[in-house]
Amino acid sequence: MKHLFQNIIVVIALLFAYTSPSSAQTVGYTYKALAAEGCSMKYRVVKQDTNYYIIATVRSDRMNFLKEPTMKIRTFSGDVITLKGELIGGGSESAGVVIGSMVIPVTEIRSTAQFSITPEEFELLNNGISKVRLSMIPMDHERTFKKDKIGKKLYLLYLKAKAKDEDF
């Protein structure tokens, strides 16, 4: 039984290592919405032309972004930001763990969306994010933070993207 859990953990770790971006600077967290399922969220900042975007990627066993998702952010100073987005990609990875004569499937779904954000809204993120809600299926992803985990880091990623563009 001990080897069973070790095998499952190794397969899951390999799935996450294989699907995670290696060169992108991201900020993220893992969240268990229900007792049986959870998700891993990663956020990064990119600049395309003159627009800035927050790229959000969810890895889960069943959660996907809608075609036109919405991200609602509440800062620790009480400001509420609503960002409109669009689905830009998705996929799944499947593997199996062999236990005796049985194969236990392990599937991970990956869904990515981009949300347009202004420099003024990035300035508000410097106050820290206390709550984030993303419209997804089969249920919305909502996470409340007691202390900031992603707000200041997203703001710093914005400053890096801005400096990279200006220092060309």
Briefly describe each language-model feature range:
Residues 14, 46, 61-63, 73, ...:
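Generic marker of residues within folded, mature protein domains
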Residues 89-90, 94-168:
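Internal interaction segment
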Residues 19, 43-45, 129:
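Assembly/interface hotspot detector across virion components, adhesins/toxins, and nucleic-acid enzymes
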Residues 37, 60-67, 79-81, 123, ...:
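Short, surface-exposed beta-strand/loop "edge" segments at domain boundaries and coil↔beta transitions
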Residues 1-28:
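Bacterial Sec-dependent N-terminal signal peptides
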Residues 44-46, 57-59, 74-76, 84-86, ...:
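A structural detector for beta-sheet-dominated domains
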Residues 67-95, 134-135:
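Extended low-complexity, serine/threonine- and proline-enriched intrinsically disordered segments
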Residues 25-75:
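An ectodomain-focused feature that recognizes extracytoplasmic/extracellular
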